[in-house]
Amino acid sequence: GDGKDISLLASYWRTYLPDTLFVCPDAPERCSVSDTGFQWFDLMDQSKEQVLIKSLVAEIKLNTLIDEVIKKNNLTPEKIALSGFSQGCMISLQTGIKRKNKINSIVGYSGKIIDTEHLQNNINSRPHIILMHGDKDQIVPVSFLLEAKEFFNTNNYKVESKILQNCEHRIPTEGSSLGLEFLKKNLY
């Protein structure tokens, strides 16, 4: 959940999307497994119910930030795209799908759906979605990409996906380029 991590991606994208505002927040909590990092919610030693409860708190915070950015910059929700890595992807999916005012897109890297039953019961919009995941990810296994794809297909979403070869828990150049092309196609 470090904003500086995703800001590296934003710096690359900014070159090709010059009229785009990038907001790269830190997640709201200090990371439970690292003194220097941040997290949207604690995944360690938590029950499924506790993870959902904590993710709902994070979702409120992200929604508040989205609404502030929209108001401050005189934007419409259709001009908003969320992008996240790992937990950032997870909270972007949950928040973006549940928003009543549909955002444009979600670019997700190495994440998963936090709680499919909860999300199934709270679908409010259908943003454009691309999910990417490394085939060698040992932090968030690639099987979660396949589960998310199945969820979205079952719920009549058109979702793009890419399994990145020989990639661990990170965003490789190929992934950043695919995310950029996806945003160019959907935002402009």
List the model feature ranges, each with a label:
Residues 6-11, 141-151:
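Short alpha-helix in the alpha/beta-hydrolase fold that links the catalytic acid
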Residues 1-75, 79:
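Serine-hydrolase catalytic machinery in alpha/beta-hydrolase-like enzymes
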Residues 8, 94-98:
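Active-site signature of alpha/beta-hydrolase-fold catalytic machinery across serine-
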Residues 130-133, 137:
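Short beta-strand/loop motif that positions the catalytic acidic residue
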Residues 146-188:
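C-terminal catalytic histidine-bearing segment of alpha/beta-hydrolase fold enzymes
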Residues 82-84, 109, 132:
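Short beta-strand immediately N-terminal to the catalytic nucleophile in serine-hydrolase-like folds
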Residues 101-113:
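A conserved short beta-strand
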Residues 84-88, 92:
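Gly/Ala-rich beta-loop-alpha elbow adjacent to hydrolase catalytic centers
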